[in-house]
């Protein structure tokens, strides 16, 4: 009996099956961001059950991969670390400790599962993972939008203060659709080494504008246009003339990205200090308000939530979806929790 189980596990623990399970896992995450649970109450429970089955498979695959590792080789590599590598290793250790602390203090398992999934994904080639996620996202996007267009999934319409209607087309919030389109453009361009023909760039532009008119997602429009300009400059060889500038931005991004959580917190608190203490007619206050307007009132919104709820070193157990649709709040005015965390959900 035990031998049969081992044989069965060996048959299913293959790279092809592993990527298929990753695709199923990613698909359940996408479904969680749709209005499926609005129409079918048990959908969220079924997706959660499927994810736990995927986690079991993840564990089996990780254990198999760990057994095949040459630990002595890794020990030798660690001995030859330079200062930069030791610094990065230290950051990784701090991050792991923080994730454990977050779990213990808030009982929030999301970061643990995210780390678990990243470890599992590292068992495969990077391009294979990208291709799997791209295919899953592309098929899911077509399926969800089609079902919504046919009336089989709820099209949640969110209205801005000025009356602008924002369609979600099957997703829980309008920005999800525009973000997925943006990511698909990035995925496809990456697969083509960012060498895109003018005709396809024109199709990109039409798609971006069309989605903007449906969702009125301004941030995604601006980011998508910046991506489009960069792809155009890469395709035409213009970026090659500015190698030093490109390298500067690459290094700046790698330095600034890990500092973003701390930096954004400092900026929000500084805005709060200016908002509460500075003269409303002063130049500093006007600059702060202008910056807040550029970020669609996010600085004030986040500072107000900090003031109302407080904050802790290792985070709080909050719902990752801030304004997303549920049966109970479709017609209600929902306040954000700490951050505009529907963007955070995309990262997960």
Ranges and model annotations:
Residues 285-348:
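Long extracytoplasmic/lumenal interhelical loops at the membrane interface
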Residues 9-33, 47-71, 76-282, 307-310, ...:
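Hydrophobic transmembrane helix bundles of membrane-integrated enzymes that assemble
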Residues 32-44:
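Aromatic-enriched
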Residues 3-5, 22, 288:
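Intrinsically disordered regions, especially transient/low-confidence alpha-helical propensity segments
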Residues 1-11:
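Short, Lys/Arg-rich, polar N-terminal cytosolic tail immediately upstream
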